């Protein structure tokens, strides 16, 4: 709708016009500050320019009113334009809010170590990545979702060792546990399965540990993929860190060629401080083994060689320090580091009845994503994880998400959608019977509700551009509240406005349905 207004204005002016939303609806639906930017060029006051622009824009049928106010030009959209757009949206649900942005984007998220089940920290990044992908595709971008498997480090050996020792314990043997190992019932379960798989006798030989490491990694990846599928998240690619190390010689040669590394104290250092890092970083240890950072450098070399327009990584907040060093490496490799965006997902704290949520016995010292999904459902989990900016700490009480009242936003929004279906049923009308009803002579409450329902495409575009999904969750909460308020205030069935209000409600339901779908949530028809 905003683009349609801008398109109309471009016919009447050769200037690029930026539209803003006035804080107070009495000043119209949109406003432009263009008179201020033209004032210096034309050597005239913004008020004079705004007066003239307002007169030239009045001729458009899409405006009910064009008014200059303190140098701004304010626009109030006509009922006929809003009705025309509403009718189109209802008849073209699959196209509503779509665009043709056309970027190719490689989106990497989750990338949890394959050494245990997914916990709620992983879940936040998973939900954010999936929602970003859905919004981006809706806006006409080609998005590839990728999971980076960290399978080259010592943690994979520790997984195999933990399974090995747990199996020996299961077989009644005395075990000396090391300081570092993986614990939790999932390790015991893997140990029992490993005994079945490899036989009791195999656990007398420590050479089995390497096999168990690879076997355990595969089992954990199966579990992770299953956990993600339970919340409707599927990846296009899985990339193994271990497999990528084959490219280290190639990458290291480029770094040396570009004078990006040097030797000191029997180690090889990356000159990352030259490009924004606080100090140089080790990429090769004294024993010749590449560091964790080297793995990241290889992976980003592999990414950028694939030629996407943009690369988005979703990392845990504890990886903040890695951004500058990875971007420095990208620069040294001859690529544009500005093409990489890193979104940081902060910690999640769960409560239950006001008390800290109990840690999972199965995982040891984590709260499992699967257990929370089982308790509150995937939809509630997704909505709450998207309800705040990713880089802010999130705390919520799972008991609140079980309530059937306005304090539970997921329920409240779904109730609005289900309520609209119920109203149509009570009225004995189908969508097809009211879809072409002209939305005219509406009161101000109805006009405001209609406009709010129709600005969903702008919210989608804004949420994706700023990578802030809470803009969409906030919008859906506000739209549902506005609908409930309207319905409680105005008579619908049996009134002279019945068909007009039913059509208005269909537009509200459409925006709720499309908005929730982009968050990975299916709107409920009945509750």
Swiss-Prot record:
Predominant location category: cytoplasm
Cross-referenced Pfam families: Arg_tRNA_synt_N (PF03485), DALR_1 (PF05746), tRNA-synt_1d (PF00750)
UniProt superkingdom: Bacteria
Catalytic activity: tRNA(Arg) + L-arginine + ATP = L-arginyl-tRNA(Arg) + AMP + diphosphate
Locations listed in the record: Cytoplasm
Coiled-coil features, chain-numbered ranges: none
GO cellular-component term (any): cytoplasm
UniProt keyword annotations, A-Z: Aminoacyl-tRNA synthetase, ATP-binding, Cytoplasm, Ligase, Nucleotide-binding, Protein biosynthesis
A single GO molecular function term of this UniProt record: ATP binding
EC number assigned by the record: 6.1.1.19
Root EC class: ligase
Signal peptide positions on this chain: none
GO terms, biological process: arginyl-tRNA aminoacylation
Summary of subunit composition and partner proteins: Monomer.
NCBIfam families attached to this UniProt entry: argS
Family, similarity comment: Belongs to the class-I aminoacyl-tRNA synthetase family.
Name of the protein in its database record: Arginine--tRNA ligase
Organism: Nitratiruptor sp. (strain SB155-2)
Lineage per the UniProt record: Bacteria, Pseudomonadati, Campylobacterota, Epsilonproteobacteria, Nautiliales
């Amino acid at each position: 709708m905003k683009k349609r207004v801008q398109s109309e204005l471009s016919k009447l002016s050769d200037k690029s016009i930026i539209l803003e939303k006035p804080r107070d609806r009495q000043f119209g639906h949109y406003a432009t500050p263009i008179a201020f930017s033209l004032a210096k060029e034309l050597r005239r006051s913004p008020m004079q320019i705004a007066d003239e622009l307002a007169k030239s824009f009045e001729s458009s049928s899409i405006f009910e009113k064009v008014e200059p106010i303190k140098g701004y030009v304010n626009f109030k959209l006509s009922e006929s334009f809003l009705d025309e757009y509403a009718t189109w949206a209802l008849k073209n649900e699959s196209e509503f809010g779509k665009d043709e942005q056309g970027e190719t984007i490689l989106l990497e998220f989750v990338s949890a170590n394959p050494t245990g089940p997914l916990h709620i920290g992983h879940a936040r990044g998973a939900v954010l990545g999936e929602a970003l992908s859905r919004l981006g595709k809706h806006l006409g971008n080609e998005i590839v979702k990728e999971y980076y498997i960290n399978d080259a480090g010592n943690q994979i050996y520790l997984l195999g060792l933990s399974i090995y020792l747990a199996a020996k314990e299961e077989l009644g043997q005395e075990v000396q546990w090391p300081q570092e190992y993986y614990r939790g019932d999932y390790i015991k379960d893997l140990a029992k399965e490993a005994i079945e798989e490899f036989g009791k006798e195999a656990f007398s030989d420590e050479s089995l540990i390497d096999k168990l490491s690879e076997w355990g990694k595969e089992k954990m990846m199966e579990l992770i993929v299953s956990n993600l599928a339970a919340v409707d998240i599927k990846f296009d690619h899985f990339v193994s860190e271990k497999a990528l190390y084959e490219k280290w010689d190639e990458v290291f040669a480029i770094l040396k060629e570009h004078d990006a590394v040097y030797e000191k104290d029997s180690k090889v250092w990356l000159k990352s401080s030259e490009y924004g890092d606080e100090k140089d970083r080790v990429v090769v240890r004294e024993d010749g083994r590449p560091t964790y950072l080297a793995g990241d450098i290889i992976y980003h070399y592999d990414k950028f060689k694939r030629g996407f327009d943009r690369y988005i990584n979703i990392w845990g907040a504890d990886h903040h320090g890695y951004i500058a060093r990875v971007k420095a490496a990208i620069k040294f490799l001859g690529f544009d580091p500005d093409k990489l965006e890193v979104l940081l997902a902060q910690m999640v704290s769960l409560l239950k009845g006001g008390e800290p949520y109990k840690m999972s016995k199965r995982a040891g010292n984590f709260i499992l994503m699967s257990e929370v999904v089982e308790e509150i459902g995937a939809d509630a989990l997704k909505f709450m994880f998207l309800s705040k900016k990713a880089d802010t700490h999130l705390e919520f009480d799972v008991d609140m998400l079980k309530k059937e009242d306005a304090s539970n936003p997921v329920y409240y929004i779904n109730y609005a959608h289900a309520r609209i279906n119920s109203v149509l049923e009570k009225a004995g009308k189908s969508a097809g019977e009211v879809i072409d009803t002209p939305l005219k002579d509406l009161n101000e409450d109805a006009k405001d509700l209609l406009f709010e329902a129709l600005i969903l495409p702008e919210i989608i575009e804004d949420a994706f551009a700023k990578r802030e999904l809470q803009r969409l969750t906030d919008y859906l909460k506000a739209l549902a509240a506005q609908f409930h308020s309207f319905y409680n205030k105005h008579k619908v069935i049996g009134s002279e406005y019945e068909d007009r209000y039913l059509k208005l409600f269909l537009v509200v339901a459409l925006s709720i349905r499309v908005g929730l779908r982009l968050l990975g949530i299916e709107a409920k028809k009945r509750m």
